[in-house]
């Protein structure tokens, strides 16, 4: 399905108040949309803030979760990092989300990871990938659209971790940039856009311990009958600013040059429309089945203040599964 066809179908479903599920890849080449009741038939199983379509129960894992990481070398990461830094220094980008795959071994199957992880937005695409995302893309209800850009993480066990996170010049600049980008994005589809919460801290539990992350809340007003434009609204906002960067169009070109491989559904979006409201997520925290291997996709925001070692370690730190 083309993106144009997706937009038309989503707008039609929205106008009819027909509940539907959708999934759009980062490159916007393989969008999927279907009536909500048909998602399971396509092998798409979701659990999104209390709404889920899982009609099966996988056997409980017999052993505690184990995860072994085999990240790319620092030299391989540095090639992409250096390319990005050159573009930042030229002023072609101010913030860029650089991602790479990490091969992993685990004693759980993808469907077990899906059922046992804790995250507000979960998706299992049978035999293809599992996603357990903490990050909202946009939520729409009562004619208001919300987004919650998430930028800035730190190991929660470090001394004064929250203070270090909030006081970091690099993390502050990164967060200001993404909030400004997302505020401008929302202004293309909504009115009276405002930041209603700025840089609040949340804790996420992982199998290796807790991490802290900072988010903000941005809100705008939509016109009546926005449901009839739901596909147009989603497409206008793509790709998600938090996993691309600013300015968006040029930054995406740099991403393709640095990463040298398509992201596919990783860092795309997925969600559901229940007939009145929409909930959606950015497809991060993502394990993909590639032939006989499992690949965990992760990354982080790069600014001109970024240090190679810090960013390389963040890439590895984000390879985690929120279980237990």
From Swiss-Prot:
InterPro entries: ADC_synthase (IPR005801), Anth_synth_I-like (IPR019999), Chorismate_C (IPR015890)
A GO term for molecular function: 4-amino-4-deoxychorismate synthase activity
A GO BP entry: L-tryptophan biosynthetic process
Pfam families registered for this protein in UniProt: Chorismate_bind (PF00425)
Matches recorded under NCBIfam families: PRK07093.1
Family label: To the C-terminal of para-aminobenzoate synthase component I.
Protein name, as recorded: Uncharacterized PabA-like protein PM1464
Organism expressing this protein natively: Pasteurella multocida (strain Pm70)
